[in-house]
Amino acid sequence: MSFEIKEATADRFEEIWPIFREIVRAGETYPYPMNTNLEEARAFWFAPGARVYFGYLDGVAVASRYIVPNKPGLASHVCNTGVMVDATVRGQGLGKKMMDFGLAKAKELGFKAIQLNLVVSTNGASLEICKRNGFQIVGTLPGAFHFRGERYVDAYILYRAL
């Protein structure tokens, strides 16, 4: 089993589209509309200024991470980042590898900190890996996430200096 992370371009988004579509359609972790189409998804993931990376397991894209300045100008030294891992390969440590890569890459790109703007309170796996990697909850957004389009749950803002 070989796992490799490479920088990606928007024209390769189709490689991770099935992963994105499955995660977003579940309505449990990302705020994108559950019926997001391919072109909308590409625009979200490859937002202006974003650097995007795909994780390949034995040559197949199974994960992705973006890193983007959280705000422009005087706050551009803080980045925002997100990651998606294919459900079929979860539990193999790939999320940890994507986290380690993201922390190192954000620092290499010159960012001083990472702010995660919306971590859903019901996303235990994400919260656990973030806490294990030095992120702290710095704010709670009551009822900020419409979980599965059925009920409102809290979301957190997480922060970590690099």
Give the location of each predicted region.
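Conserved acetyl-CoA-binding loop-helix of GNAT-fold acetyltransferases
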Residues: 91-106, 128-132
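Conserved GNAT acetyl-CoA-binding A-motif
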Residues: 106-118
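Acetyl-CoA-dependent GNAT
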Residues: 33-88, 99-100, 161-162
